[in-house]
From Swiss-Prot:
It is a multi-pass membrane protein. GO terms for cellular component: mating projection tip; plasma membrane. Signal peptide: none annotated. Belongs to the PRM1 family. Keywords: Cell membrane, Conjugation, Glycoprotein, Membrane, Transmembrane, Transmembrane helix. GO terms for biological process: plasma membrane fusion involved in cytogamy. This is Plasma membrane fusion protein prm1. Residues 76-137, 342-397, 625-740 are cytoplasmic. It comes from Aspergillus fumigatus (strain ATCC MYA-4609 / CBS 101355 / FGSC A1100 / Af293) (Neosartorya fumigata). Glycans are attached at N177, N222, N245, N256, N274, N454, N483, N490, N505, N552, N566.
Length: 740
């Protein structure tokens, strides 16, 4: 039966193919040429819609998402810029306050320094007074001990020696006086006898001599003997020793002289110390006060503006790059899609011949024609199996995983991952600039510390100059007199030694005691005086004062330590809030934006991954079902399986019944439709060779069906184009038989 216009009432979407026939009364359907005027889309019409292929659309959607992400990132960076500028302004104000701290702290530090100097000078005065008095009394005590000890030894030696000498002289004088008188008397008696005899002799001689007119004098020794009798040692023989004994020195003059001379320099030093340090007050106006500092580092070429401007330029550049790349990719995607459409069109034309042949499974033919690539992939994978049942299951699993809905889910997930990748690349480009901001923030801290160090160093230099001048003044006015007094004391000791030596020289000069006394003096006093002089010389060389100077980092040490690399706690930085774990507030703003975008990318990646996992789950469902049926033998009718599908038999005219009434039209109101008409019949084309003829059905065949035999299924004819098999020679034969 031919199609008629009344067929439109049965299936409104079915075209009136018989209307195209040259003679409507003929009983054959005229096939329309594919390149002519057809109700379906031709190649040119298909190619006109290549630009809206799925990959171009997905790439454009990715581009839109990347542009939205770039715009969102730019908006977030603008917000971060405002927050960073606000934080930078706060840091700038705090840095200016920190840099101005020397101005405020110097007043208190100056007062502390001045008070410390005054207290030190007051303590120095007390120490000097006590030291001078102690040294004065100590020197006098030592000298007094020395010369009094020497005086005791001297008196002992001299007086003992004089007393012994005077006693010896007196005894010797008394002995000599008594002995000489007795000797004189004895000599006088002897001389008188001799003189009488001698005079008598002389008288005889004179008698003779008178004859010659001469005379001999007589001997008279009485006067000499009287003199000898009256001879005695003079009483003045021990007057010198008595005088020496009575004239031993007591060194009272030396004592008075020494005390007068020694006390004079000490008293002068005390007087000068009292005059110089009596009411010493440090002049606080001499200490400097640094000026206030105003730091500006938030603006300018190295400020926050330049950083965020560079980030904005980077985002804009990245957006342009993504626009260019994705648009070019979307455009280039049209080329393979156009080639794919051309191949699909050719494949559809080739495989459309299957519709004109008798196919055992027309749905398979429709699937192969409508989904050429997925069907080809299934056939390619199924060709690796020799069992027809497994070939069917493999094709079914691939078809299940490549339905338009499943592929839409897969493409959506892949597009989401591609979008996340583009956003990640953009984020990585922005993250590379964060260390630059950290470096700039570190430079901000360095600027504050440098300003503090400069102010602190300038203040310390000026203050140290004042302290040095004060130390020099004290050394000249106070310790200068100490040096003078030590020199004078050394001179006094020399004078003491000279004076003592003079006294000894006047007393014992030219005597036997002079040398021993001088040796004792040098041993007992001279060596001690030399030791004292050495000590005074050391005091003279080291008597000066040096007040400790102020370090150059008085005001900057703490700030410099807080940003140093040795700081274990980043929150110690003076640019960080209390409790912050980041190094400062400025980089925290940018890091927060980066973390926000990163969280968004992570969320989108998870969503895209879940979408892909949904497709994987769908594919696994098909794979699991196919694997389950892989090892299950198909049950025949006798085992509870389904009935055998009868082949449509061609009648004598070559027509086949097409049950068009089996297709329900849910969009049409049943009341508006006319009653169903008999199903039309297709007329076989005279130019087409039927690939498969009707199989005569014997009674035995019907009996086999009743008994449950599956019978043969001619799947091979459904996959042949122009008599050639589309698969291997082992295509679909028997379920339970391997190919031969």
């Amino acid at each position: 039966m031919l199609f008629s216009r009344s067929g439109r009432s049965i299936f409104p979407l079915l075209p009136p193919y018989a209307a195209h026939a040259p003679n409507p009364n003929q009983g054959h359907i005229i096939a329309l040429p594919p390149d002519g005027l057809t109700p379906y889309l031709g190649l040119r019409a298909r190619l006109s819609q290549v630009w809206i292929n799925r990959w171009t659309i997905l790439l454009l959607l990715v581009l839109v998402r990347v542009l939205l992400a770039a715009s969102g990132l730019q908006a977030d960076m603008s917000t971060a810029k405002r927050e960073a500028l606000s934080a930078c302004t706060s840091v700038e104000s705090m840095g200016s306050s920190m840099a101005s701290m020397p101005h405020y702290l110097s007043q208190g530090v100056n007062e502390l320094t001045a008070t410390g100097v005054e207290k030190a000078v007051s303590g120095l005065k007390s120490m000097l007074m006590l030291t001078i008095t102690g040294v004065e009394e100590l020197v006098l005590f030592i000298i007094k001990v020395l010369y009094q000890t020497y005086l005791c030894l001297f008196t002992l030696a001299v007086r003992g020696s004089v007393h012994v000498a005077v006693g010896v002289i007196k005894e010797a004088a008394d002995f000599l006086n008594s002995t000489v008188k007795e000797v004189g008397d004895d000599i006088g008696k002897a001389v008188s006898t001799f003189e009488s005899a001698f005079n008598k002799f002389l008288d005889g001689v004179n008698t003779v001599a008178s004859a010659f007119g001469a005379s001999v004098p007589t001997l008279d020794l009485n006067s000499s003997i009287s003199t000898l009798e009256n001879l005695q040692l003079p009483s003045s023989i021990d007057q010198g020793l008595d005088k020496l004994n009575s004239s031993l020195p007591t060194f009272d003059e030396v004592n008075n002289f020494t005390q007068t001379v020694l006390r004079t320099p000490f008293e002068e030093v005390k007087k000068l110390v009292n005059e110089s340090l009596g009411t010493y007050t440090f002049d606080r106006s001499l200490l400097p006060v640094p000026a206030k500092e105003q730091l500006t580092f938030c603006e300018g070429s190295n400020g926050i503006d330049s950083f965020f401007d560079s980030v904005t330029d980077l985002v804009m550049k990245a957006r342009k790059i993504f626009i260019a790349i994705l648009i070019v990719a979307a455009t280039l995607a049209c080329v393979p899609m156009a080639w794919q459409e051309i191949r699909r069109w050719r494949s559809m034309k080739e495989r459309s011949q299957l519709v004109r042949k008798e196919a055992h499974d027309p749905m398979d033919v429709v699937y192969i024609v409508s989904r050429p690539y997925t069907a080809a992939a299934g056939i390619k994978a199924a060709s690796r199996f020799s069992n027809s049942r497994r070939q069917i299951l493999v094709r079914w699993a691939i078809a299940y995983a490549t339905t338009p809905a499943a592929l839409f889910v897969l493409c959506l997930g892949v597009a989401g991952l591609l979008s996340c990748l583009c956003q990640y690349l953009l984020l990585q480009a922005v993250e590379k600039t964060v260390p630059e901001l950290s470096t700039q923030v570190g430079a901000f801290a360095d600027k504050v510390v440098d300003s503090l160090q400069n102010a602190s160093a300038e203040w310390a230099n000026d203050a140290n100059g004042v302290i040095g001048h004060m130390s020099q003044d004290l050394n000249e006015n106070v310790f200068g007199w100490v040096n003078t007094s030590t020199t004078a004391l050394n001179d006094t000791l020399n004078t003491f030694v000279d004076k003592t030596t003079g006294v000894l020289n006047d007393t014992f000069g030219g005597t036997l005691l002079y040398e021993p006394l001088m040796d004792v003096f040098g041993c007992l006093i001279g060596l001690k005086v030399q030791g004292i002089q050495k000590g005074l010389t050391w005091v003279h060389d080291h008597a000066h004062i040096d007040f400790p100077l102020l370090p150059n980092d008085t005001f900057s040490r703490g700030a410099a330590a807080s940003i140093s690399s040795n700081s274990s706690n980043p929150s110690d930085s003076f640019l960080a809030d209390a409790g912050d774990q980041t190094s400062n507030k400025i980089t925290e703003v940018v890091i927060r934006v980066v973390n926000k975008v990163e969280d968004g990318i992570r969320t989108e990646t998870i969503i895209s991954g879940v979408i892909i996992l949904i497709w994987v789950f769908i594919a696994l469902i098909g794979i699991v079902r196919a694997l389950t049926l892989f090892w299950v033998r198909d049950r025949n009718r006798g085992e509870g399986g389904g009935a055998r599908v009868n082949h449509h038999l061609s009648d004598a005219g070559g027509f086949i019944d097409v049950p068009l009434t089996a297709v329900s039209n849910t969009n049409t109101d049943a009341r508006s439709m006319p009653p169903p008409a008999p199903a039309p019949r297709y007329e076989a084309s005279t130019s087409t060779v039927v690939a498969s003829r009707a199989v005569p059905v014997s009674s035995t065949h019907h009996e086999d069906e009743k008994l449950g035999f599956a019978g043969e299924r001619q799947y091979g004819s459904a996959l042949k184009v122009d008599g050639a098999a589309d698969l291997r020679g082992s295509s679909y034969v028997e379920y339970d038989m391997e190919k031969r």
